Amino acid sequence: MRRDISIERLNFSKQMQFIKLVICCWLVTPSASAISWRECANQEKVWYKTPEAKRIGDNVLYFQSDLGGWYKNDGSIHPSGNAAIDIRSKEGQRRHKKSLQQLKYPCTLDNDATWSEMRFLAKVYAATGQQKYKYGFLKGIRYLLEAQYPNGGWPQFYPLRPGYSSRITFNDSAMIGAITIVDDVAQRRSYYNLADEKLRKKCQTAVTKGRECILKCQIIVRGKKTAWCQQHDQQTFEPAQGRISENPSLSGAESVGVVKYLMTIDKPSPKIIDAISSAAKWLHQVKITGVRIYNFKDDSLPGGADRKIIADPSASPIWARYYEIGTNRPMFIEKGKVKYKLSELSHAKRIGHLWIGGRWPESLLKVEYPAWIEKHQAKD
């Protein structure tokens, strides 16, 4: 006959052993392994010691290019954390690896690729001490140093893919993701104090060049510094065309990431302080008030939904993704042609992209920038 066991009947030591066993079982259950790649980056420290974290780390190493970078994490060519390359046969793994090696452009910074894998490897190494994760991380750092333009910018793809992918790319945090992790190595921060002195100094040089590039890319309108475009020309630093609906413009989204990075600099130069202050002023200037985005049902349309801008005096400020250089008018773009009303876009374009309604700068302007001002005024 089975005896029922109550945890309350156990002494304190046995209770603690039981609780630890439950936690360990939870950490390796299928529910834990089903987390997304983004969630993999933000787990508790203890999780990075688990078999699941190491399994994902091994997958990350498998998908690392011989050059040191990664292709974008799209769930097919490069599966995310819960994908199972490890359940394939050895022959299946070999064939798939060969197909990856045949990619013409195997490495990118698009969609957080490369730097996000590197951050994950550093955390798994810190938790496990297994050298293969450290080596993978350092291979990634060397790739980023190789990929950087002599003028300090980073392209979206390296080896260079023709077209907009060769531009200096702020879109989707490409350049900021790259310079931030190189800066972390240069400054020996936390998990990223992994480089020898020679490599660390190379990272310091790369960061200096990268910051100079950021300052050169800041768009000046009628003598005043404003913000950044998603892409900039790799020779002239001028705002440049991206994909067909990514016209040269001022970005209400990517500019926030640039400013936040610049604010991490411990001893900012007068030029960097001016760049931050000018961009924050511009972001405040272009906020859109008195309206909100209204998503509503419409069964006559594909997907049964539509979107429009409606008046709402009580609405919180919102921002547009693209602003016209010189006028600060929100831009809605289709096949390269600029519209000035959301309603002028086709239905597919109207609902398929967040042209307006984002609150990307909200926390920056309300919390982080005021705190930064206070911090640096106190230092002065």
What annotation goes with each model-predicted range?
Residues 14-24:
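Sec-dependent signal peptide recognition
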Residues 29-31:
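N-terminal signal peptide c-region/cleavage motif recognized by signal peptidases
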Residues 34, 41-49, 99-113, 162-175, ...:
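Solvent-exposed loop and edge beta-strand segments that line ligand/cofactor-binding
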Residues 35, 64-103, 146-166, 216-245, ...:
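Glycine- and aromatic-rich loop/turn segments at beta-sheet edges
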Residues 35-56, 184-209, 235-242, 246, ...:
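Terminal, non-catalytic domain-edge segments
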Residues 55-68, 136-153, 204-223, 275-292:
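Long, well-ordered core segments of solenoidal/helical folds
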Residues 89-128, 143:
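Long, hydrophobic/aromatic-enriched structural stretches that serve as scaffold segments
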Residues 134, 138-141, 145, 162-218, ...:
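Eukaryote-skewed repeat-based solenoidal scaffolds used as protein-protein interaction platforms
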